[in-house]
Amino acid sequence: MKFPVLILNFKAYAEAAGRRAVEIAKAAERVAKELGVNIAVAPNHLELALVAQSVEIPVYAQGVDVESPGAHTAHVALGNLKEAGAAGVILNHSEAPLRLNELARYVGKARELGLDVVVCAPDPTTSLAAAALGPHAVAVEPPELIGTGRAVSRYKPETVVQTVQLVAKHFADVAVITGAGIESGEDVEAALRLGTRGVLLASAAVKAKDHYQKIMELAKPLLK
């Protein structure tokens, strides 16, 4: 996994359904190539294979609930995500929380499959526990700020700084990124100044009227 990175989570937004997911992913890819920065996209499971076939930038799954392919009706298996073209997986988002034993299994299996692994956590202490599982990155996201436009880098900078310091002290090989309420390039720049190695965001990019221009704004701070 390359850093610094901008990860765009499409969630299940109507604005990123079907071919629209490909359009946003291609806008992200265009920005990544023009600036020479790292951008990954996380489309809904329904669009993951289509997006992965359409772009060269990393495509991440938004989550998983089964380790291996098999008789698991209506479930998503890590092995199948790999076959669909996923380069990585986001785990334990506040909108899709996992039990610790599940999280530990999924992190281990994803690493075994060669997938990038990003584990979300709400606070510094939980981030440290997540880092102990061995993901490539921990994304600290206070859930009360997600989708509010109140950027964690401005409204809870102490949470970000504490997480960066705590994880660096005990698990220096695990990167810390952040998210929640990120709306602008200034928010991204502030997050990087706090010591993070990237940002995870959703609505600011997905719901933008001009995806290319918005992603360009959000990605430019990665150059500094």
From Swiss-Prot:
Coiled-coil portions: none
Q: Give the CC-aspect GO terms.
A: cytosol
> InterPro entries attached here?
Aldolase_TIM (IPR013785), TIM_sf (IPR035990), Triosephosphate_isomerase (IPR000652), Triosephosphate_isomerase_arc (IPR022891), Triosephosphate_isomerase_AS (IPR020861)
Q: According to its UniProt record, where is this protein mainly located?
A: cytoplasm
Catalyses: D-glyceraldehyde 3-phosphate = dihydroxyacetone phosphate
* EC code: 5.3.1.1
Give the disulfide map: none
Q: A Gene Ontology molecular-function term?
A: triose-phosphate isomerase activity
State the UniProt keywords alphabetically. Answer: Cytoplasm, Gluconeogenesis, Glycolysis, Isomerase
Pathway of this protein?
Answer: Carbohydrate biosynthesis; gluconeogenesis; Carbohydrate degradation; glycolysis; D-glyceraldehyde 3-phosphate from glycerone phosphate: step 1/1
Q: Which Gene3D superfamilies match?
A: Aldolase class I
Does Isomerase count among this protein's keywords?
Answer: yes
Top EC class for this record: isomerase
Q: Can you cite a GO biological process for this protein?
A: glyceraldehyde-3-phosphate biosynthetic process
Residues annotated to bind substrate: 9-11, 146, 181, 202-203
Q: Which residues of this protein are catalytic?
A: 93, 141
Q: Where in the cell is it found?
A: Cytoplasm
For this protein, the record's PROSITE patterns field holds:
TIM_1, TIM_2
Q: What's this protein's family per the entry?
A: Belongs to the triosephosphate isomerase family.
**Quaternary state and interactors:** Homotetramer; dimer of dimers.
Per its database record, what is this protein's job? Involved in the gluconeogenesis. Catalyzes stereospecifically the conversion of dihydroxyacetone phosphate (DHAP) to D-glyceraldehyde-3-phosphate (G3P).
Query: What is the protein's name according to its record?
Result: Triosephosphate isomerase
Q: Which gene encodes it?
A: tpiA
